[in-house]
Curated annotation (Swiss-Prot):
Disulfide bonds join C52-C55, C122-C148. This is Putative protein-disulfide oxidoreductase DsbI. It is a multi-pass membrane protein. It holds the Pfam family DsbB. Belongs to the DsbB family. DsbI subfamily. It is found in: Cell inner membrane. It comes from the Bacteria. InterPro entries: DiS_bond_form_DsbB/BdbC, DsbB, DsbB-like_sf. Interacts with DsbL. GO terms for cellular component: plasma membrane. GO terms for biological process: protein folding. The chain crosses the membrane at residues 24-44, 61-81, 83-103, 201-221, 226-246. Keywords: Cell inner membrane, Cell membrane, Disulfide bond, Electron transport, Membrane, Oxidoreductase, Redox-active center, Transmembrane, Transmembrane helix, Transport.
Length: 266
């Protein structure tokens, strides 16, 4: 009976109908906010891994996607709601892919034998889209305090005597902190230095893109939604507008050269 019921459910499943429900958008919110909270509370606050410029940008990208999901929860079947929810979700993914690739490039350069090749710089004061001063509104979340490409734990001396066994397992024991799982930085498999944080975040953004794009195509091709193609064009246009109008360039911002950062570790 359970097999027959499962077979009927598969037959009745429609991606177009599913994207009209709150479930996929709720999953998107849980994933993006969950990853952001893990980065902040676990890695930054608990394991003393300070976020760099690209790291806080990735948090912003996740937040943009989550806001898109929250808007969709109002009425996911409404076309006007879809315009804002899909646009923000795709916009956040676009930014996220760019920032992950940049972070991975910086990580590879900093850990290579020639750390001065191909790196422009790392800002101490971040520049967010539309010049949003997020680093002022929520500095603990959106102000970079770490070095570009260096995600090793930086434990303050006043915390040496207060580390528990769980923390020591990941960051090591004082004063050298060389025997922890993440003493050489965060990797999915630390012993092999396999898949750094940038690559894992990149995969997360790609997975979100694949699911959302499949939902978007199902919405466009739904024969019961004759105006879907028009709304889809509006969504694409809005994503482009957000991307290119949101780009902010302020030459007066304080910029710290990444070459100076690398000199500290050379």
């Amino acid at each position: 009976m359970s097999y027959i019921k499962m077979k009927d459910n598969c037959r009745n499943f429609s991606l177009s109908k599913w994207q009209d429900t709150r479930k996929p958008w709720l999953i998107l919110i849980i994933v993006t906010i969950g990853l952001t909270c893990i980065a902040h509370f676990l890695f930054q606050e608990y394991l003393f891994m300070k976020p760099c410029e690209q790291c806080v940008y990735i948090r912003f990208d996740m937040l943009v996607m989550a806001i898109g999901g929250m808007i969709a929860l109002i009425n996911p079947a409404n076309n006007i709601i879809k315009i804002f929810s899909y646009s923000l979700a795709f916009y956040g993914i676009w930014l996220g892919l760019e920032h992950c690739l940049t972070l991975n490039h910086i990580h590879e350069v900093v850990h290579s034998e020639n750390p001065f090749a191909g790196v422009d710089g790392c800002r101490e004061i971040p520049i967010y889209p539309f010049n949003l001063p997020l680093y002022k509104w929520a500095p603990s979340w959106f102000l970079p305090t770490g070095e570009c490409g260096m995600d090793t734990p930086v434990v303050p001396e006043n915390a040496y005597n207060h580390l528990n066994a769980f923390q020591k397992f990941f960051i090591g024991t004082p004063p050298d902190f060389e025997n922890g799982l993440y003493s050489n930085g965060w990797y999915l498999i630390p012993s092999l230095k396999f898949m750094n944080m940038a690559i894992c975040c990149l995969i997360a953004f790609l997975c979100c893109f694949v699911v959302l794009f499949a939902m978007f195509i199902a919405y466009v091709l739904d024969k019961n939604k004759p105006n879907a193609k028009i709304f889809a064009l509006v969504i694409v246009a809005l994503v482009l507008v957000l991307k290119f109008i949101g780009e902010s360039k302020n030459p007066n911002q304080n910029i710290a050269s990444l070459n100076q950062v690398v000199l500290r570790y050379s």
